[in-house]
A protein has these predicted regions:
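Short beta-strand element of the alpha/beta-hydrolase
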Residues: 194-198, 204-217
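Short amphipathic alpha-helix adjacent to the substrate-entry channel of hydrolases
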Residues: 219-227
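Peripheral/terminal regions associated with large enzymatic or DNA-binding modules
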Residues: 167, 173-178, 182-202
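Aromatic-rich carbohydrate-binding modules that target alpha-glucans
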Residues: 52-106, 116-178
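Short beta-strand segments enriched for Tyr within beta-sheet-rich domains
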Residues: 107-115, 207
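Short beta-strand elements bearing conserved aromatic residues within extracellular beta-rich modules
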Residues: 70-72, 111, 194
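Residues within well-ordered beta-strands of beta-sheet-rich folds
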Residues: 100, 112, 195-197
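Non-catalytic, glycine-rich low-complexity segments
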Residues: 1-62, 169-172
Length: 227
């Protein structure tokens, strides 16, 4: 898995200038801003002088039409009850939306960007962090790191900061070598599929038991057996 290190020294001046423009919240030349932004690795990851174990991560979104808002749904950070933390800010009279989050330097997770159309009800916005949200997110088009397929054909972007584990077991497409057993059961009035995977190891080797909910995601889309 490719990690996202802090901005390279050669790009620090450009990154600093863009961040100052965003922090000022004033009008900018949007075309020039995007030319400079596209010369950098995005999202923009910045080291913090007094905290070696944290990073500031700046997400950007270029809107093609007027919006009520844009929401960054970052796994375990802005989802569930933390929707407000993931709401981006628009630079006045531009197509530039931005959000900066302070994250552990070891963070690794998936995220999507959700455009919120004008006239969207407050109730719909409040549900953005739940799994039943009616507005569907998209992968970040400015993030060149390969994404993952979490649900069906929906791609999500990956943010892996520089102190995150490499997790090479998730790299590439590999076939699993163990045995996968599948059975169906009726629980609480619903049919549920249960999967049991036994890795290809000697029978005398002790094994732990890992229980994963949302098995259709882990097995059907993420390929946990091969990992």
């Amino acid at each position: 898995m490719r990690l996202s290190p802090p901005v390279a020294p050669v790009a620090i001046q450009t990154a600093t200038r863009l961040r100052r423009q965003l922090a000022a919240g004033s009008q900018v030349d949007a075309s020039h801003f995007w030319r400079e932004a596209n010369s950098l690795a995005l999202p923009l990851v910045t080291a913090i002088n007094d905290a070696d174990d944290e990073r500031e991560v700046t997400f950007l979104w270029r809107a093609a039409s007027p919006l009520r808002g844009v929401y960054v749904r970052l796994n375990r950070v802005t989802d569930k009850d933390n929707v407000a933390k993931g709401m981006m800010t628009q630079l006045p009279t531009t197509d530039i939306w931005h959000l900066t989050l302070r994250l552990p330097a070891s963070y690794c997770g998936s995220y999507t960007m959700v455009e919120i159309p004008p006239e969207t009800p407050d109730e719909t916005v409040l549900q953005l962090g739940s799994r039943f949200a009616s507005l569907v997110g998209k992968a970040d088009p400015l993030n060149s790191t390969p994404g993952i397929n979490v649900r069906g054909n929906a791609q999500e972007s990956v943010l892996a900061l520089d102190h995150a584990p490499a997790q090479e077991e998730w790299s590439g497409c590999r076939a699993y070598a163990g045995q996968l057993f599948t059975s169906e059961h009726r629980l609480a009035g619903q049919r549920r599929r249960v999967r049991l995977y036994l890795p290809d190891v000697p029978v005398v080797q002790p094994l732990g038991l890992l229980v994963l909910t949302d098995g259709e995601i882990w097995f059907d889309h993420l390929g946990v057996s091969a990992a």
